[in-house]
């Protein structure tokens, strides 16, 4: 198993040094300086690795060479240097205080006597602790150049510089050489000093051209970086007229760059656009022969401005994945169904007697189903890479705003609910698959209201006691049923039985002619005005006295579920205990008819005891004038009431009272009592 720490260290080294060839020229310079010092002082310094800096860490060799340069300057009567270096030569350990003192003395001599530029200087720690070997190498090369002017033996790189200088002086067209290179090549030499420039053999030049072609051949691009040979060791690179001088130093191909040297590999890595953009050239590569796409050679990377042949054809043609491959990658695709074919979701409708909690639960069902459908719709629309042969989804139709009057008219209509959730979404089992295929078959529920204000439902086509249950809840649908509750069987809808069902169960609005409807509205207005006048007349004869405060209702009576029951008590139900009215003087009086605010808005029918009250009031005589009447707010007779009003005898009316428009309406459309079986 690979060491993770080593992997991290390797990646860090790659991030710090993006080019492996950037350190090659430092190694080449170290080898050249080691040969130079070994030839001068017979030291035996290794040229590779850390052995070169380790041999110079005591500072003894550096101070010895400084004194040699000073003696050569004195012999030639040169102006500089004038003073040597005093140092400790015996029993000096690397890294000790004396070693640091020797290195510091050499650095001071370079600054003061030779005038080495500060950019080429190094610090004591750079040599003793081997922190910055590049600065040490560059400083030693500059010291070697200054010593070569005084007649001392120079390293091979300095000899190459002197040779290039003579070649440039012999060339008549000096303008072709860059100005920066001219400044570097102009090296002042002391007159009378013999030059020790080694001669390059023809074998070296022949090997140089072969090595250059080999390095250029490592790039596998069709259009390689141009490097044209002008003369022996002189090349023109790129599209410009820039000339570079190339020399061979041991196993390295060196290029004269500005005032220093660089390897040809590193130079091409920085100037060749193909090598700069490709990461494959940043690692050491083996030499490859003829280019063959079948061999395991590095992948050719196209240069900017020179596209690979055939790339136009590949780029102009869009990449299209075959449908068969997509099916294998993405799995089997299920045919999508347009959203218009999905059955509409049922709207939640609040009936009279329903509490707020039941209404919210009724809304949570369809809303949850709608969110599921929207989620599935978004999943259907998410993959944009579907084949065009699939059935496109039709655009969504905007939902029209629904007003309150429309909702009130829809309250009296029979509620239609689609199939259950399992029939809409799941198609795993055969029963659910059959149910989803018959999605258009819709169940009709018949909802009725009992005398105590409770609702019960039965499925259409069921006889007898088919009520699914009663309670203060919303009319149950197959979606709202719990798993434990039995589902009503979806049988064939019998036509005669549906026709024989009383209209009060469906609570459909009465179909009247426009003339009868206007006449009914006119009677209602007249009755309303008459009642208002009677209330004003009764209020004028009210004795001076404050009416007793009503008792504080219990929290169980504050919910909207008891509002309809309270209205039904005020509307007049027979046989219920504690339903006697209360007047200002404590006498019980007949109950006034109350209009239902929720359940009877869309239906012209009255409560169950409406017709009986009309008959009783006509037999008993005219109604007494009511000053202040308030019904008992108690819908639970089994519990002990908090306050029971004192019953008193009714007053005898002074004159007969005529029937109102509501009684006339019952004469037009008599109410049909629901079946006892329901």
UniProtKB/Swiss-Prot annotation:
Residues 327-340, 370-381, 404-413, 437-454, 631-641 have a biased composition (Basic and acidic residues). Residues 27-148 form the Calponin-homology (CH) domain. Residues 485-495 have a biased composition (Pro residues). Gene3D superfamilies: Calponin-like domain, Gas2-like domain. One of its GO terms (molecular function) is cytoskeletal anchor activity. One of its GO terms (cellular component) is stress fiber. The modification Phosphoserine is found at residues 306, 316, 352, 355, 394, 436, 438, 482, 489, 493, 654. Residues 461-471 have a biased composition (Gly residues). The keyword Cytoplasm applies. Residues 276-291, 666-678 have a biased composition (Polar residues). The modification Phosphothreonine is found at residues 334, 501. The modification Omega-N-methylarginine is found at residues 490, 507, 630. Belongs to the GAS2 family. Seems to be involved in the cross-linking of microtubules and microfilaments. Regulates microtubule dynamics and stability by interacting with microtubule plus-end tracking proteins, such as MAPRE1, to regulate microtubule growth along actin stress fibers. This is GAS2-like protein 1. It comes from Mus musculus (Mouse). The lineage of its organism: Eukaryota, Metazoa, Chordata, Craniata, Vertebrata.
